């Protein structure tokens, strides 16, 4: 399915569209952790014990902290670590820009590279078969690392590409001058086995069905283009098959229901360029969303760190 044609908008309308969304969010956001540069978190994940993992790209490391605990370094990397996800056994997988995918054993120890390549590796997700997928945001593609260790292109649909032109809010994404086009970003699977992909520059969610043989089906636009999805970054799913999106350049958290309808849950301070979300795992935390507040391109006065909000629906915390 091709993208709908994008109409230009006048600057006054653009600014009104961006600013008006701050009043739409109804869920309160609280602060869990405050950090300072270079320790600004881009991706976030939680394990079954409630330990939180953060990628700190400008410090070239991944750290973790238990509830109420201090930051502990998990591993350092040769370049910027972005996406962080855990498998059901607690092994930590990290997407490293220009390097590939790295794994840190659940029991601890040095990180080992399990897939290599020059992409802008970013979002990670496991399917129900245990295969690991990663987005190449710069190349606009999804790659798969299967259980045999084979690393291959899974989908190169044009819908996964980014752009250097203005997005759905009428503005160029703020990261484009530094990193170039940013297409496929956060990824997650719905209950039907379809992959949902955040397209950062275009403010879209792309749906890619999985064929019976595990190959990628034909990609289509599931939601957007929408100003409320501009800067769509990290994503996560709840048990009702809703997709949660950290819209970084909008400074907000969105919920996209199974029909593609977008609801703004939270916007404005303290959210500042939020880049990823993870559902809680502990007792009383299953409906909690933990947010990596990247603040690399500030959208408010909110400091970098970790924030928390309640989604009202239990999430899928692992993978």
Segments from the language model and where they lie:
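Short loop/turn segments that connect beta-strands within beta-propeller blades
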Residues: 65-70, 104-109, 145-150, 209-214, ...
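A short beta-strand motif characteristic of beta-propeller blades
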Residues: 28-35, 69-75, 110-115, 151-155, ...
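C-terminal region of N-terminal signal peptides and the immediate post-cleavage residues
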Residues: 18-29
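Blade-level signature of beta-propeller repeat domains, shared across WD40, Kelch, NHL, RCC1
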Residues: 278-319
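Beta-rich, blade/repeat-based domains predominating
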Residues: 35-52, 77-100, 117-132, 139-141, ...
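Bacterial N-terminal signal peptides
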Residues: 10-20
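Structural signal for beta-propeller blades
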Residues: 60-63, 100-102, 140-143, 203-206, ...
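Short loop/turn segments immediately following the C-termini of beta-strands
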Residues: 57, 96-97, 137-138, 200-201, ...
